[in-house]
Regions:
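Short loop/edge segments at beta-strand edges and connector loops
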Residues: 37, 180, 196-199, 217, ...
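Well-formed, non-transmembrane alpha-helical positions, independent of function
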Residues: 24, 47-48, 72, 186, ...
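Rossmann-like dinucleotide/flavin-binding elements
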Residues: 122-153, 195-209, 217-230, 238-290, ...
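Rossmann-like dinucleotide-binding cores of NAD(P)H-dependent redox enzymes
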Residues: 150-190, 267-311
Length: 384
């Protein structure tokens, strides 16, 4: 068994990073060799065997994410493989899980609860609407579809994924996009209808006579009432992550040092921009898992991004801000653009409008802004 470096790597380490090292050992000895190290993809695993880099592939976290990986590869069900994202949020950091969770997986909450959570056919099929095609909505949809319900997902955008799709934009997090692809494959398998570019309204939902409605409309960015917030050179983090706005060789100020703020700054920095991040907190990306956070901050430092903490933004000027630090007012100037990353709030307007229809449920960020592991967990529990 050949391992190398840190035993459990985050998404900042390339998939299959250890394969070439394993091959060097295999070429030098005459006993079977097992290789390991972020091998989470069927093509990667099969190619490692085919080119004789190893005799066996060890699937660690990938087996937690999808215990059926080998059989799915054998049966050609590649599009149904749940891919480990390297997030570490339920497999490694297991101190505060709901319902006594031990080791499990962010995108597969069934992992570790196989004997407790079982998808059984419903005694009576229902007509169910799900509003929102993010991870929570799609997870609930395919489970309900598998139970035999008639499920329709309404997604206002042309593609599914919501905020989760934007989270997959940074290069090292692109495996997140595979989660949405797999959930959609499950939806297709279990006859879930997904209607894109369709805004669900109270009138539409009432007309369709659904037995139950699940609101999974996600979150909206927090926009504080700061003077200058509407300036023409002020953008939201989502504008950057969706590539609606791209900066090159500019000086950019990011307001907010949560995970979204720092990752947005990282993306901007990778395009050759000079970036500064400001936040009133005393710690950057405080809610991020320990090792990915460490990797993120190391990369941000390598990019020359400056993070200014304990600094409260008071006003946005044409080329910077006025902020308060240690009781003193200070200024930052000379910036071409300012990006807002002040966090998220529930997008619950539709829920408030339709809750009187009866049998209406709300999950994920639409209930309380949080993260994907919370949203997917809530969706799974409700659908069961």
């Amino acid at each position: 068994h050949i391992s190398y470096g840190t035993a459990i790597q985050s998404y900042y380490v390339k998939n299959g990073f250890n394969i070439d090292n394993v091959k060097k050992v295999k070429d030098a000895i005459n006993i079977p060799v097992i290789g390991v190290g972020r091998i989470n993809d069927a093509t990667l695993a099969l190619s490692a065997i085919k080119r004789k880099a190893m005799d066996f592939v060890a699937l660690g976290r990938q087996s937690i994410c999808d215990p059926h990986f080998p059989n799915k590869v054998k049966n050609g069900q590649i599009n149904e493989i749940l891919t480990c994202t390297g997030c570490m949020q339920r497999c490694l950091y297991t101190t505060s899980f709901e319902d006594g969770f031990g080791t499990s997986c962010m995108i597969n909450p069934f992992s570790g609860k196989e004997n407790v959570w079982k998808i059984e056919k419903a005694k009576q099929a229902k007509k169910i609407a799900i509003i929102g095609g993010g991870p929570a909505g799609l997870q609930a949809a395919w489970i309900l579809g598998k139970k035999g319900h008639q499920v329709t997902v309404y997604e206002k955008e042309a593609t599914a994924g919501g905020q989760y799709r934007l989270a997959s934009v940074p290069v090292m997090k692109q495996d997140l996009a595979k989660t949405i692809s797999t959930y959609l494959a499950f939806c297709q398998k279990y006859n879930v209808t997904v209607k894109y570019q369709t805004t669900a309204t109270k009138e539409l939902l009432a007309t369709e006579n659904f037995d139950e409605i699940i609101v999974a409309t996600g979150s909206l960015p927090v926009i504080p009432g700061i003077s200058g917030i509407d300036n023409s050179n002020v953008y939201k983090a989502n504008d950057i992550l969706s590539f609606k706005q791209v900066f090159k060789n500019q000086k950019v100020l990011v307001l907010g040092a949560g995970l979204v703020g720092v990752e947005t700054a990282e993306l901007i920095g990778e395009y050759g921009n000079q970036v500064t991040v400001v936040d009133m907190l005393d710690k950057a990306a405080p809610l991020a898992p320990k090792r990915p956070r460490q990797n993120l901050l190391e990369h941000v430092k390598q990019l020359g991004i400056n993070i200014l903490l304990n600094s409260k933004v008071l006003k946005i000027n044409s080329d910077g801000i006025v902020y308060q630090q240690d009781g003193n007012e200070k200024t930052l100037t000379g910036f071409d653009a300012i990006v807002l990353a002040f966090g998220s709030k529930p997008n619950d307007e539709l829920y408030q409008d339709i809750k009187d229809l009866g049998n209406v449920y709300v999950i994920g960020d639409a209930l309380k802004a949080g993260d994907a592991k919370k949203a997917i967990y809530e969706a799974t529990k409700l659908a069961l």
